[in-house]
């Protein structure tokens, strides 16, 4: 079984990139096809550079540094890869990778991190949060995204079997592409996080500091609770704005090296998470340290946090809802959720589990495909 892995880009070490590396570990003879890639990123991920095949965008001006500027070319570029020599194509997709062209005798399995959020269900939120909901720039962006949405509709039908990274994304795949998906939660490497029972008197929030992560909402909540400390870790375009927003009880540290993040995560009273994520890796990392999570009760958080056992939920992305949840958490005692229970829950998202489930799914579907062809749901 000759395998090709398709990914939109390999330019940062993110969650989808780690998924690609894990799939490559399962199928070590596979080749990787991606629009653009950086060698240092592949080296950090442990992906051999000689296995990586890039598109013409790689050679365009600033192709690897400003690859998103070439979004209108992505559909055309992904279709130029010639994968005729492979039996199975596995696309790791949150944009156009699922649009790869395959033949009738090739099996295409898509590990879908999300339908394109800024083209579908988050379209209006994206425009608003990017300040592109009004004016000439707004119409230019809308005109650019319209053909991307049309392509994505077509690309969605090119997949033989979908894997979703969460049940929540599976529902969105059903809504967007009218297709069923099997959920296999992504691989979370918790080997670098150790269980810690020594909790201190502060809460932690950490993510990239962009609007949809709702870090500002968390800061506003703790501004209303001057007797409670909040530490915020992460870099991003909103860093200075969030520092100005924070009161004296809130420390916005900005980007920090891993050792600092891990130390703060291990000793935090609880981790506060307000984003509406497709899956969300960092709450699992927090729980792997034995730190419970106070999370927005929607989307992937309902799968990554075991409500009542490793944390609790709030129902609205508002400061008031977070205040209510934190007060409820504190009313439950000094350590309402056992660190060992948090760690045990996090271990259920291990890399070994992911690799086993991916291997079983691909091999099972390939055997069915060889015998009976495609049975589209």
Label the model's feature ranges.
Residues 129-162:
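Membrane-proximal helix-turn-helix segments that form the acceptor-binding/catalytic region
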Residues 26-98:
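Active-site donor-binding segments of glycosyltransferases and PAPS-dependent sulfotransferases
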Residues 240-262:
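Nucleotide-activated donor-binding/catalytic signature segment of Leloir-type glycosyltransferases, i.e.
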Residues 194-213, 219-225, 231:
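Conserved donor-binding/catalytic core segment of Leloir-type glycosyltransferases
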Residues 292-296, 305:
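Short hydrophobic beta-strand element within catalytic cores of glycosyltransferases
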Residues 266-278, 291:
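Acidic donor-binding loop of glycosyltransferase active sites
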Residues 317-320, 334-376:
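A charged, aromatic-enriched C-terminal amphipathic alpha-helix characteristic of glycosyltransferases
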């Amino acid at each position: 079984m000759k395998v090709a892995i398709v990914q939109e880009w390999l330019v940062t070490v993110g969650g989808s990139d780690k998924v690609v590396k894990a799939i490559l570990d399962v199928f070590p003879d596979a080749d990787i096809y991606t629009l653009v890639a950086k060698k240092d990123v592949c080296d950090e991920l442990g992906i051999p550079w000689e296995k990586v095949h890039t598109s013409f965008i790689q050679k365009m001006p600033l192709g690897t540094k400003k690859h998103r500027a070439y979004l209108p070319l992505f559909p055309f570029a992904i279709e130029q890869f010639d994968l005729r020599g492979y039996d199975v194509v596995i696309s790791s997709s949150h944009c156009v990778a699922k649009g790869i062209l395959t033949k009738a005798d090739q099996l295409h399995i898509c590990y879908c991190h999300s339908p394109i959020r800024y083209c579908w269900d988050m379209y209006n939120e994206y425009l608003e949060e990017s300040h592109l909901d009004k004016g000439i720039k707004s119409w230019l962006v809308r005109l650019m995204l319209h053909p991307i949405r049309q392509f994505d509709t077509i690309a969605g039908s090119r997949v033989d079997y979908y894997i979703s990274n969460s049940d929540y994304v599976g529902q969105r795949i059903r809504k967007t592409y009218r297709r069923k998906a099997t959920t296999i939660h992504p691989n979370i490497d918790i080997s670098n996080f150790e269980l810690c029972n020594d909790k201190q008197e502060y809460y932690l929030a950490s993510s990239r500091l962009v609007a949809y992560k709702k870090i500002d909402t968390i800061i506003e909540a703790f501004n209303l609770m001057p007797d409670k400390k909040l530490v915020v870790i992460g870099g991003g375009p909103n860093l200075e704005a969030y520092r100005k927003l924070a009161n004296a009880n809130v420390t916005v540290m900005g980007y920090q090296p891993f050792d600092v993040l891990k130390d703060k995560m291990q000793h935090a009273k609880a981790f506060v998470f307000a984003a509406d994520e497709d899956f969300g890796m960092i709450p699992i990392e927090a729980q792997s340290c034995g730190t419970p999570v106070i999370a927005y009760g929607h989307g992937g958080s309902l799968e990554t946090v075991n409500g009542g056992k490793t944390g609790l939920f709030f129902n609205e992305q508002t400061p008031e809802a977070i205040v209510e949840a934190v007060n409820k958490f504190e009313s439950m005692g000094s350590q309402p959720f056992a660190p060992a229970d948090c760690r045990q829950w996090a271990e259920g998202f291990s890399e070994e589990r992911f690799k086993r489930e991916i291997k079983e799914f691909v091999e099972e579907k390939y055997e069915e495909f060889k015998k009976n062809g495609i049975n589209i749901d």
